[in-house]
Amino acid sequence: MIPFLPMFSLLLLLIVNPINANNHYDKILAHSRIRGRDQGPNVCALQQILGTKKKYFSTCKNWYKKSICGQKTTVLYECCPGYMRMEGMKGCPAVLPIDHVYGTLGIVGATTTQRYSDASKLREEIEGKGSFTYFAPSNEAWDNLDSDIRRGLESNVNVELLNALHSHMINKRMLTKDLKNGMIIPSMYNNLGLFINHYPNGVVTVNCARIIHGNQIATNGVVHVIDRVLTQIGTSIQDFIEAEDDLSSFRAAAITSDILEALGRDGHFTLFAPTNEAFEKLPRGVLERIMGDKVASEALMKYHILNTLQCSESIMGGAVFETLEGNTIEIGCDGDSITVNGIKMVNKKDIVTNNGVIHLIDQVLIPDSAKQVIELAGKQQTTFTDLVAQLGLASALRPDGEYTLLAPVNNAFSDDTLSMDQRLLKLILQNHILKVKVGLNELYNGQILETIGGKQLRVFVYRTAVCIENSCMEKGSKQGRNGAIHIFREIIKPAEKSLHEKLKQDKRFSTFLSLLEAADLKELLTQPGDWTLFVPTNDAFKGMTSEEKEILIRDKNALQNIILYHLTPGVFIGKGFEPGVTNILKTTQGSKIFLKEVNDTLLVNELKSKESDIMTTNGVIHVVDKLLYPADTPVGNDQLLEILNKLIKYIQIKFVRGSTFKEIPVTVYTTKIITKVVEPKIKVIEGSLQPIIKTEGPTLTKVKIEGEPEFRLIKEGETITEVIHGEPIIKKYTKIIDGVPVEITEKETREERIITGPEIKYTRISTGGGETEETLKKLLQEEVTKVTKFIEGGDGHLFEDEEIKRLLQGDTPVRKLQANKKVQGSRRRLREGRSQ
């Protein structure tokens, strides 16, 4: 009979507990079995934290790190659950004998629980008929229980102790594979719920007590050994907060933000609850601002709550969790302490309630969404924020406004920059503050952003980088209550001059500029556009005589091909390139140019750039010390080949006798602007001695056609219309004519005006400005026998200058209405009035 029991228990274990790939506990156990197989059959490798009795089936991560929660571990080899050693044999070749639940408690070493089961008269129940799951506290768990609680249980074994043990039991067999994450299982004491959590790292907890020895099969159930004694729970998180004096500040904040009631509902929450001491650490102004802002206070409260139940024993390393606020926090461990965002702050852990678990912390967690934009800066942006505060810009960032900070890292500020005149430094900082809130996902290539200083900054988006002007972003963008912050590698320098102006300003580029102008390409670099120009310094032309330069200039096609190979459409910032890989661009000449960013240096056709990212209003300049030449373009002229070979030694220039350079059309990059001006409408409202005049100003419709640069050939004799950039200037005039309104339409009009009797009639004229305005007003205040003016055209003036001068000299110009005269614009109305 005895040999049959081990065989029977092995068969039963295989039937009721097959390995399930979706069962995290079994999966980790299988890994531990594999790591221990060199020690013999059915041996599992465990990691034990040095200086403690805590043991874990190892995960891959912890196994190779040789640490858990930052503490070193040692490897133990033990029999896997359900097996035992035999004297003289390697490994664990025998299965444990099977017994009823009471007997199994002794087999697994839970002798204190076994003794208490006997004392409370529970033994008869768990030896008899039925099927039970017993979460049995280990002997160490009983030793760690509060002494007063333990004495209370021992003094009333028939009621208190029995009830406590029943609260550790389920009236059916449930193996670890059956214990699903988030389950609430009624216990055998008043159906009080047992909260089950089954974590991806293989940890299984019951009311936050970890199963340290699971799946010990019994004839009438199963025993799981746990690392602590379960306490009865019946209150919610809300109930605990309302009853706990040390959470009065948190309670007040939760009530203000309408969060407290939500913590009384069903769920599986984790609350990191700041104590009163934690709130006292906050600057009063910060706390008052947040609590006075409903959105910010709600965000603050929700940032302390997870929608999952995270027991301390489940945390074996850093992991990121999403809060109810929407942002994430990192929960980790350092020895026996829980860390939040890398900081030890948990004073008391694993306060289990009927809808979650509470960890008390000594710091208030403030999410970015509750912070002012200046508070979003981290340790690497303190130079920027300190300067913003010192120069008075921080006070200008109103809590009710919205801004974006483009914050350079600390090492972007050189000693020369910091020693600048404060007025100049303030202007530089203003270039790093935008008037609006712009998140990272709202930025796009070609976007124009306006700073609080009135400067316009351009956005460039590349495969692996986002840049604004000359500086590219680093990771760390955040959004706060009244703005966003983006981190930049360098100080942003807005462009002030065009490509041509930059070349003209810098004497290093005088030779290249003279060749560019000789090739009739000056206009290209003065027009608005987006270009990348690779500019050779004068050193690139050392050794070239004036005669050789003249030869080069005489062959305009060759010169244009060479110059345009240095120019490519689009703005490409050096730091915007993906490091270490070749970026291929097509030049305006048509051939390809190869760029690579290596060790913060831009390589152009494998030549090191001497200086990069010189920003201009219509592009960017990268400086090289060699003349560039397209390797796929042959030369067919001996003289030209000799000159080029003299200047270019890093490639072998092809020579094909008789070959000529292709003609490249002179290109103009323009932005088309169509401006439509609608004539003003004039309305007359009668019924008073003084006419009521309503003037509707000109309507301006501005259409901007965006897209790729337009290239076209300028033919000889063709008229080129220059687009003038900037806002059109519209002069506004008001015409007032007293008398009877006469509507002018597009048809033949005949009208005679006869003035009889002593009645004085005159036409009142008002203009929108001009040097004769005051004199004209004076004239109209004097007695005038008769003034008649027919309005022709639509220029907005009643009289020409010469007519006004004659009028001032005493002449009275009179013009008769002419037949067959069509008035321009069917919507024009003439207003005449009469004044006596």
UniProtKB/Swiss-Prot annotation:
Glycosylation positions in this chain: 599
Database matches in SUPFAM superfamilies: FAS1 domain
Compartments it resides in: Golgi apparatus; Secreted; Secreted, Extracellular space, Extracellular matrix
Domain (EMI): residue spans on this chain: 40-94
Post-translational modification: Gamma-carboxylation is controversial. Gamma-carboxyglutamated; gamma-carboxyglutamate residues are formed by vitamin K dependent carboxylation; this may be required for calcium binding. According to a more recent report, does not contain vitamin K-dependent gamma-carboxyglutamate residues.
Purpose of the protein: Induces cell attachment and spreading and plays a role in cell adhesion. Enhances incorporation of BMP1 in the fibronectin matrix of connective tissues, and subsequent proteolytic activation of lysyl oxidase LOX.
Name this protein carries in UniProt: Periostin
